[in-house]
């Protein structure tokens, strides 16, 4: 495991920290994270990618695709980023934490689970199977592919209404239908 020392200077009663942070995301959750990060006395510079129109006052906006890990890595090296905070799920599910842990070019710390842990959010089926395997209480379910519509409809007899249908994978909070 690689660690990086964060600069901390002490003068009489004050500490001055120098941490450069890259926040990945563009939604409301990331906006709230940027707001709180920008208030930290430990922050030197906050970089936000891709951000949204309301976040430009909180930090430096970066025209960066969070799914292009090599581009993120180049940005991290160029701007001497100490910490990456991943707000959106897609880069986590794609393995950004694993990528930077394996990187020989940078020793940046990533806040966010590794790819396998992110699958709990990234795949409803993975999460349900995990819960069953570890005896974690969860609602009954059945999983079907898009080519199994007849089987899915037929299985409704085994469940009691109301039914909740969820898309497997990331859906930006819009992958649920309830009847």
PLM regions: where:
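Glycine/small-residue-rich loop that forms an oxyanion/phosphate-binding "nest" at active or ligand-binding sites
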Residues: 101-114, 121, 127-134
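Short, positively charged and aromatic/hydrophobic N-terminal segments
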Residues: 5-6, 15
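Short, glycine-/small-residue-rich phosphate/pyrophosphate-handling segment
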Residues: 123-144, 152
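Glycine-rich phosphate-binding loop of ATP-grasp-fold ATP-dependent ligases
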Residues: 139-143, 163-179
């Amino acid at each position: 495991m690689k660690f990086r020392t964060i600069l901390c200077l002490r003068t009489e009663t004050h500490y001055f920290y120098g941490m450069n942070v890259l926040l990945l995301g563009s939604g409301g959750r990331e906006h709230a994270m940027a707001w709180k990060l920008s208030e930290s006395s430990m922050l030197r510079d906050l970089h936000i990618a891709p951000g949204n129109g309301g976040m430009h006052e909180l930090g430096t906006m970066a025209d960066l695709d969070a799914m292009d890990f090599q581009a993120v890595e180049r940005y991290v090296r160029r701007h001497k980023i100490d910490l990456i905070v991943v707000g959106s799920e897609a880069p986590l599910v794609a393995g950004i934490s694993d990528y930077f842990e394996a990187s020989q070019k940078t020793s940046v710390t990533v806040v966010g689970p590794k790819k396998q842990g992110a699958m709990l959010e990234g795949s409803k089926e993975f999460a349900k199977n995990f819960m069953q395997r570890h005896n974690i209480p969860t609602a009954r379910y059945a999983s079907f592919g898009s080519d199994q519509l007849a089987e899915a409809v037929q299985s409704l007899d085994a469940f009691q209404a109301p039914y909740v249908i969820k898309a497997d994978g990331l859906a930006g909070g819009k992958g649920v239908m309830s009847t």
